[in-house]
Amino acid sequence: MKTAFGRSVPVALYLAMILLPLILAVERLMFVTGMNPFQAILHLDEHPFGADAVAFTFIQAILSAILTVTLGLPIAWWLGRYEWKRVGIIRAALTLPFVTPTVVAAMGFLALIKEGGLLNSIGIDLRNETGIVGSFSNIIGVEYSGHIVALLLAHAWFNLALVIRFVEPKISTLPPRYEDAFRMLPVGHTRLNRLTQFWWPMLRTSILSAFVFTFIFSFTSFALVRWLAPNMW
């Protein structure tokens, strides 16, 4: 009994720390809006921009997750497959963006894309969409494409650590003899077959988990959308 009670106390405290802020936030939201979250969802189509905002949020979260996984997989591969000096420092540096406050990250990207910023100085004007970015926007016919690109890059930078932390341990702990044995099979002679028949089944769960978590964080992002795409809504 004492052991069970001793285990239940920290679990209860942990759940309280997670659920209490959420309950207070929902209560505050209901007080301000005058309706509960379920009513807000049911009446979403009554807002003039409600459906468009949800569609934009869903699309940018999907694109952010795809971009993050695309950039994170090679880094996770290099960290897991090869030996690096001071790999702990490298992992810590790659994890740093994820623990950076979103407002700080937004200010950093605003400094990059502002007039006279680093990207602007090399001809990439994501802020005012002139030059190359303006021509690209006219070709694809998407308004505020520069803001969207900045937002996707910020989400990828912010969530890159998720992909690395999910995928890299799986790669680094896989015994090399498994791949050597697969190479001896007829289906393992080509790199494409090894990728689709060996590595994908091994890493599928980790990759999909990283994709889902990145999508969730991008979908619920507010500060980055507020500061990097202020003209969208």
Predicted regions and their residues:
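Short hydrophobic, aromatic-rich alpha-helical segments embedded in or entering the lipid bilayer
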Residues: M35-L42, N231-W233
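Polar/charged alpha-helical tracts
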Residues: Q39, S121-I124, R183
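General structural signal for secondary-structure boundaries
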Residues: P37, E46-H47, L185-G188
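Membrane-water interface segments at the C-terminal ends of transmembrane alpha-helices
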Residues: K2-G34, H47-S172, F198-P230
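Generic anion/oxyanion-binding catalytic loop in active/binding sites
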Residues: L42-H43, L192, R226
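Short helix-to-coil transition segments within interhelical loops
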Residues: Y82, L174-L203
